[in-house]
Structure formats: C-alpha cells, structure tokens
C-alpha cells in the first residue's frame, strides 16, 4: 500500500528548514520539496540556545513556537503546490531543531513543539526520535544510516554514504554485514562560523575562499589533537564540542594567520577526519556517495577525491537522489517505521543495547 509522508529537517547549520514529501511503498521516493530560509532573528535565538544562558526554558519555548509555525506554513504551502489535502498524508516526521546533544550525559534536546504542529496542520506528527535510543544506551545519533541502507544498498557493491551537514557522518553499507555508522567530526559548521565571523557571508560558496588559502600545519595538528578524533565509534558530536570558540582557543596559541588560511585549514580538517574515519573503520568501499550541503563544496569534494584515490567519490545525484533532501526524506521514513512498529535504530551505529522503535506520536 502506498503512503505519503512529510519529512521535516532543520540541521545544525541553522540555515533553513527542509520539508520533503515522500511516497512510501516498498521503497522511498521523493515527490516534492519546500525550503524555508531561517529568519535572521530565529537563527540568532536558536544559536543562542546551543550554549548555556539565562532563562533558557522560556527562550526555548518561544523559539520553538516560531519554528513550529514556520514549519506548519511550509507544510501547507507544499500541500497546496502538490494539490494534496491533509487526508492524503499519513504523518509528518519532524526532527525538530537540536539545541544540545550530550549522549554521554544521557540527553539530546530537540525543540519543535510537535503537539502544536499536529494542531496547526491537522496531520499526525511523529517526533522525538533520538531519546529512545539514548535510553537504550546509545548515542541517539546518527539515525540516518538505516535509511541510507534502505535507499542505497543494492546487495552488490560495498559503499559508504557520507552526509556533510553542520557535522559529517558516515554510513558503511556492506552486503554481508550490518550497516555501521558514526559522526566523523565537523562538516560545514566551522567553515560557516569562520566565514560568517570574518566576511559576514553565510557560507563559503564552492569552498572558493578556502581554496584561496593555504593549510597551516601547526593549526591543523592542534585541531586534530582533539580527543573526539581519537575515539572509535559508535560516537556522535555537536556544537557543544566544535564551535567558533574551539577554533579561537587553538588560534590563540599560534602567531596570527591569514583568515583564508584558517578557512583552508578547517576544510582540510573536515576532509581528513572523514577519510581517516573510513580508514580506521577498515571499510572496504568502492564508492563514497555524498549528500548534504557539503556535496556542493567543490573544494571539499576535490580534496576528498584526492585523499581517496581508490574510491569513487560521487554525489547521491548519481542514484537520482538530490543530496540536499536525503535527511528530510530520512525523517519521513522514520515516521513510517514508527507507525509500522519497525525498529529503526542500528546498534552497530549508535551503540544501543538493541533495536528500538523510535519516535513519539502526536495524533492529528
């Protein structure tokens, strides 16, 4: 039987909200999309909630109402554009907006007010996907490897799927073993933060600014010494660890560097931590499929290809899947798994004690 779901994803980059309409039968097919750029005031509010401050509960409640109302408007626009009505949609899978992720301390916080979203859209909402895995001893992240496996496993070739959003994570898909996956480290988060602080640009288009600089070996060595990079998976990370303050902490110990050289070094950090993660996992992979915003960073894609000469590096576009929409599709699929009672975490990815059904249901 065919079902339609809507997936909503707002990632750690805080640049916008992705809304995807998914048709789900024996496979997942992207039908349509809608993108909402993050308003500057809401971006600032959400970023402020990623670190400790005054009156956090009230600030979070106000911010999530704004976020939720934006999503509801986006869902209504998408339905109208596709000549769909509320009754056509089985559920919305809403990831929410992560403001803290500290699985070692037993929590991951996503705001988004799924109850209000169900009320405003009159559609059942599935949300809160991470906490059940954490309750079972897992990292609660990454959650997309199971979807990567469903989408890209052809039972023939060994391949890896790399998502480069604010942070980068890998899914290792081999036909003769369970899917594995983990966070590698910063994806775009430091690149975006640095260019925003130095040039007041939202991101480094095509990686052009990074390409204009030179990698500084001393800075790179200091960045790579972070304990996270020495830890084997399962592992996940977030802005609590990698942020602009972390970059400045390491820069403070060095002579002044040209801003473009810092950007080049941050890009090298992203590329190296991805390729070293692949090597540490001893993954036998012929192909690396890249999704997320980082797939559009030409300098980063070029560097990955240079560091992985025996691996074909491609965008997921090769499989007819737009790299910008894989994560939103994944949360639509996770909503489907929840309603069907299908466990969707992977203990080989998160370290949980077992398979669990993920998500909390807010009926329409």
Swiss-Prot record:
It is an enzyme of class 2 (transferase). Its EC number is 2.7.1.170. Catalyzes the specific phosphorylation of 1,6-anhydro-N-acetylmuramic acid (anhMurNAc) with the simultaneous cleavage of the 1,6-anhydro ring, generating MurNAc-6-P. Is required for the utilization of anhMurNAc either imported from the medium or derived from its own cell wall murein, and thus plays a role in cell wall recycling. It catalyses: 1,6-anhydro-N-acetyl-beta-muramate + ATP + H2O = N-acetyl-D-muramate 6-phosphate + ADP + H(+). This is Anhydro-N-acetylmuramic acid kinase. SUPFAM superfamilies: Actin-like ATPase domain. The keyword Transcription does not apply. ATP binds at residues 11-18. Pathway: Amino-sugar metabolism; 1,6-anhydro-N-acetylmuramate degradation; Cell wall biogenesis; peptidoglycan recycling. It comes from Pseudomonas syringae pv. tomato (strain ATCC BAA-871 / DC3000). Pfam families: AnmK. PANTHER family: ANHYDRO-N-ACETYLMURAMIC ACID KINASE. Keywords: ATP-binding, Carbohydrate metabolism, Kinase, Nucleotide-binding, Transferase. InterPro entries: Anhydro_N_Ac-Mur_kinase, ATPase_NBD. It comes from the Bacteria. HAMAP family: AnhMurNAc_kinase. Belongs to the anhydro-N-acetylmuramic acid kinase family. One of its GO terms (molecular function) is ATP binding. One of its GO terms (biological process) is 1,6-anhydro-N-acetyl-beta-muramic acid catabolic process.
């Amino acid at each position: 039987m065919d079902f339609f779901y809507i997936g909503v994803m707002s990632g750690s980059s805080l640049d916008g909200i992705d809304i995807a309409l998914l048709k789900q039968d024996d496979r997942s097919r992207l039908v349509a999309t809608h993108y909402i750029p993050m308003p500057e005031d809401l971006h600032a509010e959400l970023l402020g909630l990623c670190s400790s401050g005054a009156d956090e509960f009230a600030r979070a409640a106000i911010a999530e109402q704004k976020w939720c109302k934006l999503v509801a408007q986006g869902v209504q626009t998408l339905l109208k554009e596709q000549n769909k009505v509320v009754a056509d949609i089985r559920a919305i899978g809403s990831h929410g907006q992560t403001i803290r992720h500290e699985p070692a301390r037993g929590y991951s916080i996503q705001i988004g007010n799924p109850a209000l979203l169900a009320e405003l859209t009159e559609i059942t909402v599935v949300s809160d996907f991470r906490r059940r895995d954490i309750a079972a001893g897992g990292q609660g992240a990454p959650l997309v490897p199971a979807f990567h496996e469903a989408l890209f496993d052809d039972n023939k070739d060994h391949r890896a799927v790399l998502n480069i959003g604010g942070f980068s994570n890998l899914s290792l898909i081999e036909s003769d073993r369970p899917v594995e996956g983990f966070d590698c480290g910063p994806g775009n988060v430091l690149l975006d933060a640095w260019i925003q602080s130095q040039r007041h640009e939202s991101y480094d288009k095509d990686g052009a600014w990074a390409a204009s600089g030179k990698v500084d070996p001393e800075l790179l060595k200091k960045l790579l010494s972070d304990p996270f990079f020495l830890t084997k998976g399962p592992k996940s990370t977030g802005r609590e660890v990698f942020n602009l303050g972390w970059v400045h902490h390491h820069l403070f110990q060095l002579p002044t560097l040209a801003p473009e050289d810092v950007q080049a070094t941050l890009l090298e950090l992203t590329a190296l931590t991805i390729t070293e993660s692949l090597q540490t996992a001893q993954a036998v992979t012929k192909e690396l499929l890249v999704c997320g915003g980082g797939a559009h960073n030409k300098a980063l894609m070029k560097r990955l290809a240079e560091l992985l000469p025996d691996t074909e590096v491609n965008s997921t576009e090769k499989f007819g899947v737009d790299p910008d929409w894989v994560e939103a599709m994944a949360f639509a699929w996770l909503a489907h798994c929840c309603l069907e009672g299908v466990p969707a975490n992977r203990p080989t990815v998160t370290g949980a004690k077992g398979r669990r059904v993920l998500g909390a249901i807010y009926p329409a």
